Amino acid sequence: MGFFLCSSSSIFFKFGISIIFLVSFSGLTPSEAYDPLDPSGNITVKWDIITWTGDGYVATVTVYNFQQYRHIQAPGWTLGWSWAKREVIWGMNGGQTTEQGDCSKFKGTIPHCCKKTPSVVDLLPGSPYNQQIANCCRGGVLNSWAQDPATAVSAFQLTVGQAGTTNKTVRVPKNFTLKAPGPGYTCSPAKIVKPTRFIGTDKRRVTQALMTWNVTCTYSQFLAQKTPTCCVSLSSFYNKTIVSCPTCSCGCRNTSQPGNCVDPKGPRIASVIPNPGKNAYIPPLVQCTKHMCPVRIHWHVKVNYKQYWRVKVTITNFNYNMNYSQWNLVVQHPNFDNLTQTFSFNYKPLTPYASINDTGILWGIKFYNDLLMQAGPFGNVQSELLFQKEASAFTFEKGWAFPRRIYFNGDNCVMPPPDSYPWLPNTGSHKSVGSLFAAMALLLIVFLHGNL
């Protein structure tokens, strides 16, 4: 009998560890390249050949951010590819390559880039007018499609030499890559499509590209970073419990080797403020917390009215190395179909499945709170949401008032476990009794095991 108890307890222990391991990593899988809240979201690169030249062609390359709520912030996108033959870039407008490469074999006019694998970036605002084209020169920053389609497009023009001069002799580039600004995007092979049609400014004449191909790039949070980037905490007026972000949501504090986070009261705080003129990707340097996340979203159920209920949403930045410009928040909750008012955020419903309206995107008001400042006294933005009650569904029981899912800047945030949500007082007692019975059962098993 004793052997049976020992063996079974060992099996249950191993089984429990296995379940915990699987649950811990279930949130970060390669399948996250498909986003159920934005199933058709992608970045599409369209390459239009506009005219032929003596040894190649002139093309306009347009980058469309068709993602509803994932934008590209500074220092912006970097687009790369491999030439199929020995092509060179003679000149560019609206963008530039990051390296020229070895052009020593050329005499006279030197190409803009001779690399087999060029990387192109957008020009910065304020670039000379003779180097600009339409939709260029925003430093590679692209807004999300839901926030502002007009600024979700970027373009550059390049003159390609040592290439084909007909549709049959041109070879499409291969191995496209997109950094925005870091990793996370996987690009498809270029696909030749029907030539793009252009409508004239007077809308009376239509021209078309000589040849067009498209590249589609999709995002995976699993590829973008090893750990999550945000977490969610919860509270309510009907329960004193404040549910914090789960411990180690975005990594654990390294106590043996200090330096992976900053104590806000420590002497090092003044030295970590980044140089605002540095136009390069800077990894997060976060405030020392139990959750170790760069960003925390707090959802507080604030007031219960007769026909309405109110929520306060606070976004706090714990990252000393990042100001989040044009930030956005996506929230999934069944009562969004009855959202009545947002007090200091912009709001737009997201309905990837037309019959279901349970998801909304929130973002800051321009020049007021569209910039989430770096960690510190000004590193937060907040708003309140007013929902109308739906008699058939509304309840404060069993955590119904809390969101099902939250995204910050397109990344899925770590939610607290459902059994930790603030419960109504009359149901909290049942939870306590259940926990008491579980503890008593565990003590009984230990007692029996010790006496057998």
From Swiss-Prot:
Subcellular localization is given as: Cell membrane
Q: In which tissues is it expressed?
A: Expressed in roots, stems, leaves, flowers and siliques.
Q: Which InterPro entries match?
A: COB_C, COBRA_pln
Residues annotated as glycosylated: 42, 167, 175, 214, 239, 254, 323, 338, 357
Keywords in alphabetical order: Cell membrane, Glycoprotein, GPI-anchor, Lipoprotein, Membrane, Signal
Membrane topology value? Lipid-anchor; GPI-anchor
Q: Which family does it belong to?
A: Belongs to the COBRA family.
This one is known as COBRA-like protein 1
* Natural source organism: Arabidopsis thaliana
